[in-house]
Design a protein with these regions (language model features):
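An anion-binding loop in the catalytic cleft
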Residues: 217-323
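One-carbon transfer enzymes
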Residues: 1-232, 246, 297, 306-309, ...
Length: 323
């Protein structure tokens, strides 16, 4: 079976390495152009070994078209005579003309329990919405984005402290395992999978920088989840408002909800620091309290929130607001 793999970033790497380890006939890698890869690393993707580096180490041809659906991209794919596309976080949507090139079509390794969280950022939106579990779906590729028949799934719980980066790395391993299982089944004969229930479909749109902006009207659990979801990019941020002084932009890197503690202060208000608590406490929605543990002020290094407070001298009425 001649396989063309398409992927960009750390989520794709275990699937690629698994195919190579199991002696599958990978005839080419399609990955984003180097410029686009750099942009992705600055945004939603973590830096890994690099799909291109893996391919070059194994003497596998690398193609990096800006538009895979162009006449040039289509011609290259046809010349490769693939039996199967294996796609994992590639970063480009394949046209119907491209999808019919391989004799067996294409499979996609998607980091959610489809039909929930169709789109470019399933891991981040899963965490932001306080889901308790997630997983990886292997689907048959169709012109509908993430809408093909489900060939396999694996389910896993989400740890209360997992960031999007942590979870994506873990899901990438699970995805590689079940993708290989699906390919082995396809080698033995046709498989059809189960259609998705469209009524359950939800979206996971690509993240933008402004998605990191913290809404203090949410409760502490929701804000904590939002902060984890925005790691490693775009990172959750807020403005510290002080009387008669310019606001300070702060990235909040780590925080947890204060269990059972409540406050009547308006959301965003910084509570009076306690010498016994090595954190910054902030009022959130529904009378809840968020324990802020680690921050990074604009232009400064990462630091414990308590250290930040000591250096800034808290005053009654200081608050955090949307930027």
């Amino acid at each position: 079976m001649r396989i063309v793999i398409m992927g960009t970033g750390i989520f794709s790497e275990p699937t690629f390495e698994s195919l190579l380890l199991n002696k599958k006939d990978v005839v080419a890698l399609f990955t984003q152009p180097d410029r686009a890869i750099g942009e992705e690393k600055a945004s939603t993707r973590q830096v890994g070994k690099g799909m291109k580096n893996i391919a070059l180490q194994h003497h596998i041809p690398v193609f990096q078209p800006f538009k895979i659906n162009s006449d040039e991209g289509l011609a290259i794919l046809r010349d490769l005579r693939p039996d199967l596309f294996v796609v994992a976080a590639y970063g480009q949507i394949l046209s119907p003309e491209v999808l019919v090139v391989p004799t067996l079509g294409g499979i996609n390794v998607h980091a959610s329990l489809l039909p929930k969280y169709r789109g470019a950022a399933p891991v981040q939106w899963t965490i932001a919405n306080c889901e308790k579990e997630t997983g990886v779906s292997i689907i048959q590729m169709t012109p509908t984005l993430d809408g093909g028949n489900i060939l396999a799934t694996v389910v896993t719980p989400i740890s209360p402290e997992e960031t999007a980066g942590d979870l994506e790395a873990r899901l990438s391993i699970l995805g590689a395992t079940i993708a290989l299982e699906v390919i082995k089944k396809m080698e033995a004969g046709p498989i059809h999978g189960l259609p998705q229930d469209i009524s359950l479909a939800t979206k996971a749109p690509k993240l933008r920088k402004e998605h990191g902006n913290i809404n203090w009207e949410l409760n502490a659990l929701q804000i904590s989840a939002h902060i984890r979801a925005m790691q490693p990019w775009p990172t959750a941020f807020t403005l510290w408002q002080r009387a008669e002084q310019p606001p300070v932009r702060i990235m909040i890197l780590k925080a947890t909800p204060a269990l059972e503690a409540t406050t009547s202060l308006p959301p965003g208000t910084i509570l009076e620091p306690s010498k016994d608590l090595n954190m910054m406490q902030v009022a959130a929605g529904n009378r809840t309290i968020l324990n802020v543990l680690e921050v990074q002020p604009a232009g400064k290094r990462k630091m414990a929130a308590a250290e930040f407070l000591r250096g800034r001298h808290w005053f009654s009425g200081d608050s955090l607001t949307r930027a």
